[in-house]
């Protein structure tokens, strides 16, 4: 079976000269469809950099990022945008839009995909049920606890039914 995500020899450095820091050095990972794969490590170990390289939010200095066997590094901007719709990320900082309700935050990625407002709201309500927050649909991020914000971020990441989360 072909891996859904494969990273081959990824390296990423930040800074230059004496200030240069190697965040990733020749990292290779293969994740099969349906596989649960976790990345753990100490603070500053490069976990976030590695995850951001999966959809090229962070471009590695060298190596390959493959999705269904296709190299993301060689894709056009349009092709990469289409692949990114199939890969969702849940970041430690929630990145919720403060001026939008919980429901509207979950609808946001669907709106970007051109889904009708009615269908987006229906999907968002389903996801609020799944994450156990159906009563928070009209709450703004400032009215939510940290755990509730994280669950809204999870629901938002699931909204597009991604192949990789």
Where do the PLM segments sit?
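ABC family nucleotide-binding domain
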Residues: 2-165
């Amino acid at each position: 079976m072909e891996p859904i995500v494969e990273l081959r020899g990824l390296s990423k450095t930040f800074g230059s000269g004496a200030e240069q820091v190697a965040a990733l050095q020749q990292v290779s990972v293969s994740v099969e469809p349906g596989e649960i794969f976790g990345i753990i490590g100490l603070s500053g170990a490069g976990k976030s950099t590695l995850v951001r390289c999966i959809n090229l939010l962070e471009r590695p200095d060298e190596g390959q990022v493959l999705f269904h066997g296709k190299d993301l590094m060689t894709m056009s901007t349009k092709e990469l945008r289409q692949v990114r719709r199939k890969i969702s990320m849940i970041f430690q900082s929630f990145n919720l839009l403060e001026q939008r309700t919980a429901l509207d935050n979950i609808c946001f990625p669907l709106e970007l995909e051109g889904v009708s407002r009615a269908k987006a709201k229906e999907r968002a309500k389903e996801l609020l049920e799944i994450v156990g927050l159906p009563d928070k649909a009209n709450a703004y991020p400032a009215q939510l606890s940290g755990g509730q914000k994280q669950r809204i971020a999870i629901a938002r990441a699931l909204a597009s039914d991604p192949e990789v989360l």
